[in-house]
A protein has these predicted regions:
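Conserved N-terminal beta1-alpha1 strand-loop-helix module at the mouth
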Residues: 2-86, 91-103, 123
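Conserved anion-binding
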Residues: 68, 83, 95, 101-168
């Protein structure tokens, strides 16, 4: 019992550290469809430019396998150690959450709000960042246990929409 409590406290401390780093660094660079040959030199260039948060996306088109994404997450995580936090993006399934965790991801970013994905992310001790568009979806994401919510898709909404959502 005491061992489990200590383990839970360690998981919470690790998650709190990831949250504080996301709040501190704010910018998450997104890696999508980058070859294994280019991923580390691209990550190093971003790191040298001050980026400390990187997201490797799962390819839902089937062009790149889940294992390919896991390999890239693992390459970045092992190369940079604690100097950089890598997460997985475009995560749609609980299986992808587990694959990302095993590869070294510290946070999960999804384009949607899926209660099962959020729950699995929290069970794995990772930070959950689902996507949501409406105030109802945003509230639902938080109710499911999301640590942050990504406004998605946001490209055509404008600052007025964001201000309106934040107003209440």
């Amino acid at each position: 019992m005491a061992e489990q409590l200590i383990q839970l406290e360690q998981i919470k401390a690790q998650k709190d550290l990831v949250i504080s780093n996301i709040l501190k660094y704010k910018i998450i660079a997104i890696f999508r469809n980058i070859s294994n040959d280019e991923i580390l030199c691209t990550a190093e260039a971003l790191y040298n430019g001050g980026i400390r948060l990187m997201e490797v996306t799962f390819d839902q088109s089937g062009r790149f396998s889940e294992e390919y994404t896991a390999k890239q997450i693992s390459l970045i995580a092992s190369h940079f150690g604690d100097g950089l936090l890598v997460g997985a993006g475009t995560v749609l399934t609980e299986r992808q959450v587990a694959i990302a965790r095993d590869a070294g991801a510290k946070y999960i970013i999804s384009p949607n709000t899926d209660e099962k994905v959020i729950k699995k992310t929290n069970e794995c001790g990772m930070v959950s960042i689902p996507g949501a568009l409406t105030p109802t979806e945003i509230q639902y994401a938080h109710a499911c246990g999301a640590d942050f919510v990504k406004l998605f898709p946001a490209d055509n909404l404008g600052i007025g929409y964001i201000k309106a959502v934040l107003a209440p």
